[in-house]
Amino acid sequence: MDFAWVKTAFRTKRRRGRKPIGVGRWASLAARLVNPLALGSLAVGLSACALFDFGPPGPDDYPVKGIDVSYYQDDINWRSVVADNTAFAWLKATEGGDWSDPKFAQNWHGAAMAGLPRGAYHFWYFCRPAMEQVSWFLQNVPYDPYALPPVLDIEWVDSKTCPGHPPREAIIPEVKTWLEAIERYYGKRPIIYTSISFYNDRLRGAFPGYFVWIASYKGHPVVRDPSLRWNFWQHTEAGRVAGIRGRVDRNVFNGSTREWQAFLEGRLNPDG
């Protein structure tokens, strides 16, 4: 369950024409909300809390932050990236069955030398058989027991060489083949990266037990779809991080630092 909103719940806010509420008054209010003797019951306190609508948590409210990169970011100073509160990075490795990122090997080595947990991701091509895409990923991404789980990036793109949107019944078996083959080789269950619309249209319910990484630039994933289960959130493609010239995708992990450590050790249940 996500409690990242708690840290923002009692921030001092200046309202137009009014002085900000002091810390003492917030403390008094908090005591009244949680003290059963003052309000009669905890239920009453929770009802009172509901009167304050602070909105969903923002990216800054999640303690574990990371990036994903490709050759578009050019040369990266990975030590500066780590120093800028970056806990993880996924690096584009392959696309389809015949394209590899020209910066992948450099990024793979550089991130590891900087002590940053990093993994590789594959961009799905709908007009290539799953096993060809598996083979291509294996050729380009070395086995490393300390790497983050591989990621499958699957989403709709405008492609002149592969037009059309295959139906769910055509996509699910192919994706399942890729995920299972990659897990057998690397020993870690892959993560599924996608958009909310693609997840709902083509993937929802088909892959229980997999971590889900959602791209949502227009707002918090749960605000856009309250029923959505997500583990990573790509909240912008225009982020700034020390060590990288220009823009970069930024992400957060849906959990505490303790849960992140459990994820790194393979002990975290993706379904909660």
Predicted regions, residues:
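C-terminal motif of bacterial Sec signal peptides marking the signal peptidase cleavage site
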Residues: 47-48
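Bacterial N-terminal signal peptides that target proteins for export
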Residues: 13-37
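Substrate-binding cleft of extracellular glycoside hydrolase catalytic domains
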Residues: 62-75, 92-177, 183-185
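Catalytic domains of cell-wall/extracellular-matrix polysaccharide-remodeling enzymes
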Residues: 149-226
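Residue-level detector of anion-binding/catalytic polar loops
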Residues: 87, 117, 189
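Extracellular/periplasmic catalytic domains that process cell-envelope and extracellular macromolecules
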Residues: 59-61, 82-85, 113-114, 143-146, ...
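Functionally critical loop-and-helix segments that line ligand-binding/catalytic clefts
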Residues: 55-70, 199, 207-272
